[in-house]
Amino acid sequence: MTLETEVQSLRQVPMFRDIDPARLKLLAFTSERVNFAEGQKFFQQGDAADAAYVILQGKADVAVDSAGQEIKIAELGQNAIVGEMGILSDTPRSATIIAATPTTALRIDKRVFLELLTQFPQMSIAVMRELASRLEKMNAQLAQARR
C-alpha cells in the first residue's frame, strides 16, 4: 500500500476529512502500518489507550467482556477508526478489537492524535459529532432492547 493510498483512506474517515492533504500525508508517514492475522487482537478491553487505529484493509470485530464471555457487538470495515475513545477520555480500552479477516491498519500514536485535535478545531468538532452519533445509536439500541 502506497503513502498516497493511505492518505486517500484517511480522507474517508469523517474526522480527518477537512485536514489539509499535506498534514494527512505527514500523519500517514509517521503512523505505523500494522498487519493483523485473522483472530489477532488489536488490543484487549482494559488495556491502556496508547493509540488509535484506522483500518486500511480488512474487517475487525468489536467485542466486550460480559461475565467472562466475549460478546461481539459490532463489525468495523475499511476506513473505520477505532481506539480514539480511550485516548479522548484517558481511560482503559472499553472493548476488545479482533481482526475478523487479515487486516492492515495505521496505528496513530496517542500524542500525535491529541496534537491533531489541538491544531485542527474542525477535527475536534468532527470527533464530538462522531461520539454523539455513537451515543445516539447506543441509546436507540438500549431502548429497543427494553421493549
Show the residue positions of the predicted features:
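Cytosolic regulatory regions built on CNB/CRP/Popeye-like sensor folds
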Residues: M1-R147
